[in-house]
């Protein structure tokens, strides 16, 4: 795993800003764009677009979203 994290939290898709680390299908992705009801996620291997209403984000030591 690339970053140290302190748990996860489920939030609505609109709360993910670019750079937020997201857990999706048991993999870590970085949110890159949140437009037109779609969230674009990327990692070193793939880029995907999701329309899920609720997503799971990683938290840092202060309980805030982990950003890169």
Residue ranges and their predicted role:
Residues 28-53, 57:
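Basic/aromatic-rich interaction segments and small domains that mediate binding to polyanionic partners
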Residues 1-17:
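Mixed-charge, Lys/Arg-rich low-complexity intrinsically disordered regions
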Residues 2-6, 48-68:
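Intrinsically disordered, low-complexity, charged/polar segments
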